[in-house]
Amino acid sequence: MNYSIIIYILGWIMNVEAVCMLVPGITALIYREKSGIAFLITILACLAIGVPLVSRKPSKKAFYSREGLVTTALSWIVLIIVGAVPFVLSGAIPNPIDAFFEIVSGFTTTGSSILSDPSQMPYSINIWRCFSHWIGGMGVLVFILTLLPLAGGYHMNLMKAESPGPSVGKLLPKVQSTAKVLYKIYIALTIALIIFLLLGGMPLYDSLCAAFGTAGTGGFGIKSDSMGSYSLYIQIVITIFMILFGVNFNVYFLLLTRKFSQALKSEEVRCYFFVIIASALMITFNVRHLFDNVWEALQQAFFQVGSIITTTGYATTDFNQWPAVSRTILVLLTFCGACAGSTGGGIKISRLLLLAKSVRKELHLYLHPNAVKKIKMDGKAVSHEVMRATNIYMIVYLMIVAASIFIISFDEFDLVTNFTAVVTTLNNVGPGLSLIGPTGNFGIFSPLSKLVLSFDMLAGRLELFPILILFLRETWKKF
C-alpha cells in the first residue's frame, strides 16, 4: 500500500474543503450570524493540517486500483467528519451523531434529514447543507483530479473508484481533461438553473440552495414543506433540471461535440426517459381525484417521479397520502435510480438493463443450449468483467439491505418505515414512506440506527465496494 500518496491526496481534500467552507462563512458574514466563527475555526484547522500534508510530495507515485479504492473511501470519510464540525461547534446540531448523519446525507446527495424544520436553522448552516450536495454530486475526487499533478495514467484509478455506474469511460484521451469537461458541464448547468430560478422571482439565497440541491440531486430543503410553497413555474423548472442532472454527462459531451447520432443511440437514456414518462402517466391517472384538474395531477406526478428516479428527494406534496399504486411506483423508482455517469444515485438504469439482458440471455440458452449469444449495450459487447461486477454488486446490495433492515428493526417502528428508510438511504433518495415521508424526518431513529443508515448512504454513494474494502485485512498490506 502506497500510504504516502494516500496521505498526500487527503491533504488536498482538507484544503479543498476549507476553500468550500468560505461559501457558508461569507454567508454568515452577510447575515451577521455567530455560526461564522464555527466555520472560521474549521477552515483554519483544515488548512493547518492540509497544507503541511500537500507540501510534502509523495516518495512513490505508483497508484493502482487498491490505492484508488482506499483513497476514495478515506477521502469521503475525512470530508464528512470535517464537514460535520461546524454543525456541532455552532450549536445548530449539537449532537455529534445527528450532525454526522446530516452531513453524510448532504455529501452523499441523499437528502434524508434529522431536522423537523430547516427554516429554523441559520442561513450559513442551511447553505452548507445544500452546498454539500453540490460538492458531492459530481464527486469531490473528480474535482481533485483537475488539480492533482499525478502522472503515468494513475488518475483513472481514482475516477473508477468514485464514479457511479458499472463502468467508466474517458471522454478525452487524458482522464484529467475528462474531469475538467465534466465539471464545466456541471457548472454550466448549475448556473443556467440559478438564472431560470431568479427569472421566476425566487430570492437569490433560495435560488442558490435550490440549485445546489437540484444539481447534486440531493434534496435538502430550507423550508419545512420542501418545494411545496414555491410557484408552479419554479416547480416546473426544478422538475426539468432534476431530470437533466439524472442524464449521463457523457451524453451532454457528445451533444456539445455534435455527435448527435451517438448520443441518441444510448439505450440507458432512452430507457430513462421512457420510465419517467410511463411512471408519471400511471401516477397521474391514479391520483387524478386528489387534485383540481388533470394538469395539476400531471405536474405533481412528473415532479415526484423526477425527484425520486433522480434520487433528488424534493417534494411538492405529501405523497405518503397517495394511493397504494402510486406509492408502490415511487418505491420501485427508488431502486431504479438515474443514469450512470450522472449525479443521481440508485442502482442505475444501466445496471438494470444489463441484468434484464442477462436474464433474457439465460432464457434463450435454455431453449438453445448450444447458441453463442453476447450481451450488448449500445451495439457494443459487454465484457465478462462488467457483467460479473454487476452481478456481485446486486448480491452485496441485497445483503446490505437485509442486514440494515434487521438492525434498525430493534427501534420497533413499522416495517414500511424500516424498509423505506434503508432503501432510500442506500439509494441516496431522501424521503421514505410512513413515519419518514415528506412531512417526517429521520430524527426518530436511535443513535445506532442513524449510524447504520449513515453507513448505507456512504456505501450507496460509493457504489458499495470502496467502503467495504476497508474492512479487508489484505487491503492494508504493503507492496
Model segments located where?
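Membrane-proximal intracellular helices of multi-pass ion channels
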Residues: 1-479
